[in-house]
Amino acid sequence: MRRYLLFLVAACSLSACAGARQPWVELGGHRYVVELAQDDAARARGLMFRDAMDADRGMLFIHDTQEPQAYWMKNTKIALDILYFDNDHKLVSQQRDVPLCSLGDACPPYPSNAPARYVLELNAGQAEKLKLQDGALLKFGPGIPQAK
């Protein structure tokens, strides 16, 4: 019994530590655990071919420079809010409730209306739920690279 308890305590500790290492952002008073897309391959793949995403999850795309960005929904099976942030983590553009697209390479782009460095994709409806307005600040948790 004592070994079992020791094992249980160790397993719980390890799972808590693993959860603490997951990158996160805060926006509008809500915390989202995010996957990071920091290179060209990860940014190109994005959330393609995913059937669902938990409500408290998202993907943060980190670009090398702040410039106009455009995203599309090719092979993306989840309707999304695409949120664009500048070097200072300020929301500069929003594409809300972006629908699925089955047109392959003919899927339309969803551009930023201003130069952006970071792009956060959340499940469609999150921006409305948070009542986001341009100028909202995105807070980074530990381990997310800052603009240089």
Enumerate the language-model features and the residues they cover.
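Compact, glycine-rich, soluble single-domain proteins
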Residues: 18-148
